[in-house]
Regions:
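Catalytic core of pol beta-like nucleotidyltransferases
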Residues: 1-25, 31-38, 50-103
């Protein structure tokens, strides 16, 4: 996992609580670390929202994405868990994902 994520862990936790996130996991090059290019790579995050509260609107989802991007200083792809249909992509996410937050 890239150091930027650990450096901003407290702020990430605060955003997760604010937006009723149950789990937030990093995957892709930011999880692997070795092939992450600080000049070009984005950060791929898998989000699971709390099922006990109303699901956030798309506007709220994109607000969370934008706040995470501003915090981390780079583009963030915020993928909703369960929305990935391609079995090969799902398998790759499962292989590399690392937890950032769990409620």
């Amino acid at each position: 996992m890239i150091p930027t994520l650990d450096a901003h862990r407290a702020e990430i936790v605060a955003l997760c609580r604010r937006f009723h996130v149950r789990r937030l996991e990093v995957f892709g090059s930011a999880a692997r670390g070795g092939d992450f290019d600080p000049a070009r790579s984005d950060i791929d995050l898998l989000v699971t929202y709390d099922a006990e509260v109303p699901r956030p609107s798309l506007a709220e989802h994109f607000t969370l994405r934008d706040l995470l991007a501003a915090l981390l200083g780079r583009k963030v792809d915020l993928v909703i868990a369960g929305a990935v249909r391609n079995p090969f992509v799902r398998a790759d996410i499962e292989r590399w994902k690392e937890p950032l937050y769990a409620a």
